[in-house]
């Protein structure tokens, strides 16, 4: 089967890492890298690899001969930029995989809902924190109702480029919504920390869920199965320690300032780390790896299901 040609908009950290992964794909062909900064390392690297490039942004890319041959467009720019890109690409009948928090299309978490939404013309990969934590919330909510899910994603400051920094507010909003709509939590909250420590620290994620009483061994098994599923395409994704449990009873409830009633039930805490494959940035940048690996897996699944718009 012929490979499907793809283009990536955004020549920063995420776009360049995705480019390096796409070059390894058995079903996708890296056709064009699109940027706006002619001095960017991503564009220079693409040129050295013999990949077509443009520093004229999407506006110039759509006028080039290569555009017609591209079936899937990855957008690795910013939420604000994607709002405009989505409209242009929709009019031109291109399949879009959005790696920004813009969330124009439905959220995609490969291990949770990928096959249900890959047929949509524009799909959203949530955020790096969402890709790491929503699967865990979904695993727990598959065992017992999750009333509240809170996640903290800590990433190395050095791994966060201009696009990521511009998206901080959208990161928290989009991740929280995905915890609810895909993860199954009644209420979600997300926090991101850009850790400036040197040497840079590996990506760490904490997931805290308040849920109904349930069998702890069943929850732990569900979490471990989900971790194994994610690790199939993100090998550096793993549990940092065993799943932690704490029970709150009527005699010792958990007082929540934002809730009218005290919480009684089970608190589940899951601690994760994500080591990158170092295809572009070093292994500490697991936040890049999980985002780009999820996007690549989604696009490859589109080719498997022949669910590419305009084909």
UniProtKB/Swiss-Prot annotation:
InterPro entries, alphabetized: Acetaldehyde_dehydrogenase, Acetylaldehyde_DH_C, NAD(P)-bd_dom_sf, Semialdehyde_DH_NAD-bd
EC number(s) recorded for this UniProt protein: 1.2.1.10
Segments passing through the bilayer: none
Residues forming the catalytic site: 128
Single GO BP term: catabolic process
GO molecular function ontology, one term from the record: acetaldehyde dehydrogenase (acetylating) activity
Reaction catalyzed: acetaldehyde + NAD(+) + CoA = acetyl-CoA + NADH + H(+)
Key words of the record: Aromatic hydrocarbons catabolism, NAD, Oxidoreductase
Group of enzyme by EC: oxidoreductase
Protein family according to the UniProt entry: Belongs to the acetaldehyde dehydrogenase family.
NCBIfam families: ac_ald_DH_ac, PRK08300.1
Name this protein carries in UniProt: Acetaldehyde dehydrogenase 1
């Amino acid at each position: 089967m012929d490979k499907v040609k793809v283009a990536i908009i955004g020549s920063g950290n995420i776009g360049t890492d995705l480019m390096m992964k796409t070059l390894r794909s058995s079903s996708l062909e890296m056709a064009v890298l699109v940027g706006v900064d002619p001095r960017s390392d991503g564009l220079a690297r693409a040129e050295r690899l013999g990949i077509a490039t443009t520093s004229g942004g999407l506006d110039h890319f759509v006028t080039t001969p290569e555009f017609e041959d591209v079936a899937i467009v990855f957008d690795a720019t910013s939420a604000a930029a994607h709002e405009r890109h989505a409209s242009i690409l929709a009019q031109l009948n291109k399949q879009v995989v959005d790696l920004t928090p813009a969330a124009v299309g439905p959220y995609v978490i490969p291990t949770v809902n990928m096959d249900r939404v890959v047929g949509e013309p524009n799909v959203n990969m949530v955020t790096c924190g969402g890709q790491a934590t929503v699967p865990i919330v979904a695993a727990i909510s598959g065992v017992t109702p999750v009333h509240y899910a809170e996640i903290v994603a800590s990433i190395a400051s050095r791994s966060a480029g201009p696009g990521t920094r511009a998206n901080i507010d959208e990161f928290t909003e989009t991740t929280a919504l995905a915890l609810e709509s895909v993860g199954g939590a009644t209420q979600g909250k997300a926090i991101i920390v850009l850790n400036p420590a040197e040497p840079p620290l590996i990506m760490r994620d904490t997931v805290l869920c308040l849920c109904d009483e349930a069998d702890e061994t069943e929850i732990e098994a569900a979490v471990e199965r989900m971790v194994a599923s994610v690790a199939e395409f993100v090998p550096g994704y793993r549990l940092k320690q065993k799943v932690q449990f704490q029970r709150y009873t009527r005699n010792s409830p958990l007082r929540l300032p934002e809730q009218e009633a005290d919480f009684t039930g089970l608190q589940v805490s899951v601690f994760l780390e994500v080591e990158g494959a170092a295809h572009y940035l070093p292994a500490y940048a697991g936040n890049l790896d999980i985002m780009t690996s999820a996007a690549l897996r989604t696009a490859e699944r589109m080719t498997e299901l022949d669910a590419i718009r305009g084909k």
